[in-house]
Amino acid sequence: MASENNKRKASEEALSPDSQLQSKKARTDSPEREPKSEGGPLGKPPLRIVPFPEKPAVLEERRGEIEFRVVNNDGSRDSFVVLTGLKCIFQKQLPKMPKDYIARLVYDRSHLSIAIVKHPLEVVGGITYRPFNSRRFAEIVFCAISSDQQVKGYGAHLMSHLKDYVKATSPIMHFLTYADNYAIGYFKKQGFTKEITLDKSIWMGYIKDYEGGTIMQCTMLPKIRYLEIGRMLLKQKEAVHAKIRAFSRSHIIHAPPKEWKNGACKIDPLSIPAIKQSGWSPDMDELARQPRHGPNYNQLLHLLNDMQNHSAAWPFTQPVNRDEVPDYYEVIKEPMDLSTMEEKHEKDMYPTPQDFIKDAMLIFDNCRRYNNENTPYAKSANKLEKFMWQQIRNIPEWSVST
C-alpha cells in the first residue's frame, strides 16, 4: 500500500492552479481543412473529401447537452452532487464491488474523477482515478457508463477527455487498471494492453490488487491529442489512399467478358486479364473460405469466460508465482491455469471439448495434489470443477461426447 507521502492532497495537487478549473470542455470543432486540388493525374478521378462521421457523444457535447467535469472532494456543493452521482452509477454498474468501498474511494481526496454531466447536474458516467505524479502514472479505479446511455460513444469519448486532461495538467504518461473479463475488450479499444512495460518497482504496492482481475497498461503519446485522434486517423487513411490511387488501376471500369453477351456462363477467372494481373489463384480463394476457428470455438470461449468470472476462480487465474511458492514446480510437473488456457484457446489449440476439459481438470487435480483438502484452494478447485460440469451439461451435443 502506498505511504501517506505519496497520496495526492486536495489542497496541494487536486486544487493546483493547473487543475482549479473543475469543468473541462473539449475543443471539438472541426478544424478547417485545406482545399484539395480539383485536378489529378491524367485518367485519374479527382480526390474527394470524405466527411468525418462524428459520434453522438461529440455532437451532444458540441450542442451543450453534456459536459465533462473534473471533480474531487473539495467541499463544494456541485462537486459533492457530481461525486454522489458517480458513486451511484459505480455501485449499480459494478455490483461485485462492495458499496462502502466504492463510496470511500470516490469521496477520497487523493482521488480525482471525470464525469459526464447532463443539465442540471445529472451524471451519466465517469472515471475515478488516483494520480501518482512523482511516479508518472495513474490508477484507474472505477469506470462506468449508465446502462441506458451505452450506445452513444460516451465511453471512448470519456477516455479521450481523461487522457488529454491528465497530459495537460500533470507529468503522468501511463495508466494502470485492473479489468474484469467483461471490461478487457473496452480497455483494449482505448489503447490498453495486458503487456506491462512499467517496472514493478514503480507501481507495485501503490495500486489495489483485485482478485480475478487482469492488470492492463496504457502509455500515452505526448504529441497526440486524443480528442482529435479519429479525425487524424481519417486524414492518414486519405493520404494513404491517395498514394495508392497514383499507382492503382482499380478505379478503371472494365467491360464485361464477351462470353456474357448471350447470358451468364461458366468461365475461367484466370482468362480475365485483370484478375490474372492481380496475382489471384484458386488456392487463395479456397484459403479465404476456410473458417477462422473450429466449430467449438465460441462455446468454449463462453465456458472459459464463465469459469474466469466465477467466485472460486481466484486461485487459478494466473500461473503460480515461483518466487512466492518455491517448491510448487518441483511437485507439479504439468502446471496449468486459466490465463494459459485463454492463450491456447486463442491459438485454436482446443479442437474438441475433450481437449479443453483435459487442461481444466489439470488445474483442479494439480491444486488438490499440492494443497490439503481442507484449504481454501482445494475447496475452490472443487467448486469451480462442479460449476464447469454444470455448464457442460447444459450443452446437449457436448454431454453426449464428454
Swiss-Prot record:
Its EC number is 2.3.1.48, 2.3.1.-. One of its GO terms (cellular component) is nucleus. GO terms for molecular function: histone crotonyltransferase activity; histone H3K14 acetyltransferase activity; histone H3K18 acetyltransferase activity; histone H3K9 acetyltransferase activity; histone reader activity; lysine-acetylated histone binding; transcription coregulator activity. Residues 1-49 are annotated as: Disordered. Acetyl-CoA binds at C143, A144, I145, Q150, V151, K152, G153, Y154, G155, A156, Y182, A183, I184, G185. Gene3D superfamilies: 3.40.630.30, Bromodomain-like. Residues 295-395 form the Bromo domain. The active site is at E139 (proton donor/acceptor). The keyword RNA-binding does not apply. SMART domains: BROMO (SM00297). GO terms for biological process: negative regulation of induction of conjugation with cellular fusion; positive regulation of transcription elongation by RNA polymerase II; transcription initiation-coupled chromatin remodeling. It is found in: Nucleus. InterPro entries: Acyl_CoA_acyltransferase, Bromodomain, Bromodomain-like_sf, Bromodomain_CS, GCN5, GNAT_dom. Residues 66-221 form the N-acetyltransferase domain. Belongs to the acetyltransferase family. GCN5 subfamily. This is Histone acetyltransferase gcnE. It comes from Aspergillus flavus (strain ATCC 200026 / FGSC A1120 / IAM 13836 / NRRL 3357 / JCM 12722 / SRRC 167). The gene is gcnE.
